[in-house]
Amino acid sequence: MPDSTVQQPITDDTELRRKNRATVEQYMRTKGQDRLRRHELFTEDGSGGLWTTDTGAPIVISGKAKLAEHAVWSLKCFPDWEWYNVKVFETDDPNHIWVECDGHGKILFPGYPEGYYENHFLHSFELQDGKVKRNREFMNVFQQLRALGIPVPHIKREGIPA
């Protein structure tokens, strides 16, 4: 009697994981003028942005053309920015990678004095076949306020055993 069991193809995510991780690592090590080409790591409809802001609403830049424009702005405002202490974490989903890192450099926002900005960051990368579909950046917005010389309120947390 013939075997009527349908064989399911074996899927191996190893190559996809390698490709996606290489993209994330390239994104995180990109510095200087090379940042003007970082949008090439994204899908055509890809997005990136800052999910922790002073308004509470994310700043999202969508599409390769807008990401290219954002790179010009970013290089002007953060001319010597670099990520360091980069740790890459793969997840159960080969298309989702998290990064924990630190970043530092000059901050040159119009209307504020030149400052030096340091912060700790988390990045969520959602990928599609080795290209970034969505990058979300999370950081402590108070550190950016301090770097711009903006007074930060103090929260009284009485009773916390620290």
Swiss-Prot record:
It holds the Pfam family PHZA_PHZB. Keywords: Antibiotic biosynthesis, Virulence. Gene3D superfamilies: 3.10.450.50. The keyword Repeat does not apply. One of its GO terms (biological process) is antibiotic biosynthetic process. Involved in the biosynthesis of the antibiotic, phenazine, a nitrogen-containing heterocyclic molecule having important roles in virulence, competition and biological control. Belongs to the PhzA/PhzB family. This is Phenazine biosynthesis protein PhzB. It comes from Pseudomonas fluorescens.
